[in-house]
């Protein structure tokens, strides 16, 4: 109903209606502006449009105190300095751990609920226990994907050993799981800037995607590199994606896994450019000269597996965007091998 109402108002408020429809998720609206005046104009217009159909926008939240002051009225619910992603469960609303600290304007994590869940059963974990805990990690952007990947690789080992759902994990896997959960408190230190530095005056806007693969997993990680008007560059982690490789009997060769990581990188390019609507200068990096050779040549030369993936990669990206990076300088190495929280947080390359 409200979408039909907004479409009717599009001729009168084209910019605001477009922003709302583009950034509305169920009943949560996430938007922004370059300055306080523009933010207030968007917020007030949105409030008035929804008021026409008796829908009140509330729970206003902003990293700008001046914007919040304009909505600190009795009819509005008081804003807090943290926006938590929650879901409804039998026990009530539970924080999934990802939050936005508006005072410092960073995306951060609260692993306390994971730590408490791990303490409830310190030893004798079953496959069900491990999967239950790891599935509670809510990291849609993949900011801590190497940590989650390490858990998933351990799950695969449990499957390979034929461990039943309620069967105890072998001692070596139990010890590995214990080390992972013991390091979860380090996730408190993950703080990623919400604003990546883009503005109407920032140029150029670079997107760098790194990809890598190992026999256990493959993945890609994306960074934004922005040059401000003062000539300084700002580099921020945007997102990442990891995947565990198939079981050994169905596992492709390592060069083909490297090509799969390039495909994953290309898909991330499409996702980010579509979502941000920014004219990025894209550069894709891989440490596999074989995969780069496949991408840079005519796909018709290769067999079906390689040909299909090269077609997809070159349909999304240009072959000239792809460059080689030494393996030791590739941050996506963490996406292909996994890392505990204790190793990921201090890793400068991430």
Model-derived segments and spans:
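Active-site palm subdomain of RNA-directed nucleic acid polymerases
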Residues: 1-41, 45, 267-283
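Conserved pre-motif C helix in the palm subdomain of viral-like polymerases
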Residues: 1-13, 103, 128-152, 251-262, ...
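Catalytic palm subdomain of template-directed nucleic-acid polymerases
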Residues: 18-56, 66-74, 290-303
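Short, conserved micro-motifs composed of acidic
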Residues: 61-88, 328-332, 337-349
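C-terminal reverse transcriptase regions that engage the nucleic-acid substrate
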Residues: 87-201, 206
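Acidic, metal-ligating active-site segments
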Residues: 205, 209-237
């Amino acid at each position: 109903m409200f979408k039909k109402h907004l479409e009717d108002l599009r001729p009168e408020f084209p910019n605001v209606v477009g922003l709302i429809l583009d950034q509305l998720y169920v009943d949560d609206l996430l938007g922004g502006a370059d300055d306080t005046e523009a933010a207030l104009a968007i917020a007030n217009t949105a409030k008035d449009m929804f008021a026409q159909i008796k829908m009140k926008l509330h729970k206003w939240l902003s990293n700008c105190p001046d914007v919040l002051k304009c909505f600190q009225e009795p009819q509005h619910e008081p804003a807090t300095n943290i926006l938590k992603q929650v879901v409804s469960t039998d026990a009530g609303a539970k924080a999934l751990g990802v939050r936005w600290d508006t005072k410092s304007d960073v995306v951060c994590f609260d692993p306390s609920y994971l730590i408490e869940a791990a303490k409830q059963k310190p030893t004798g974990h079953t496959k069900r226990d491990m999967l239950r805990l790891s599935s509670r990690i809510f990291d849609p952007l993949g900011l801590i994907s190497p940590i989650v990947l390490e858990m998933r690789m351990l799950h695969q080992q449990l499957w390979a050993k034929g461990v039943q759902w309620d069967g105890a994990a072998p001692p070596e896997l139990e010890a590995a799981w214990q080390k992972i959960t013991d390091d979860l408190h380090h996730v408190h230190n993950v703080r990623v800037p919400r604003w990546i530095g883009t503005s109407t005056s920032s140029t150029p806007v670079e997107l760098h995607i790194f990809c890598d693969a190992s026999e256990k997993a493959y993945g890609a990680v994306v960074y934004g590199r922005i040059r401000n008007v003062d000539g300084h560059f700002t580099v921020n982690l945007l997102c990442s994606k990891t995947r565990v490789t198939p079981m050994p009997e169905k596992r492709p060769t390592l060069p083909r896994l490297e090509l799969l990581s390039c495909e994953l990188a290309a898909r991330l390019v499409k996702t980010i450019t579509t979502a941000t609507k920014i004219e990025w200068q894209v550069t894709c990096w891989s440490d596999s000269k074989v995969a780069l050779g496949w991408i840079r040549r005519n796909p018709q030369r290769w067999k079906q597996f390689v040909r299909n993936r090269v077609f997809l990669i070159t349909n999304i990206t240009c072959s000239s965007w792809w460059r080689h990076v030494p393996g030791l300088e590739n941050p996506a190495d963490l996406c292909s091998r996994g890392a505990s929280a204790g190793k990921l947080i201090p890793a400068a390359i991430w």
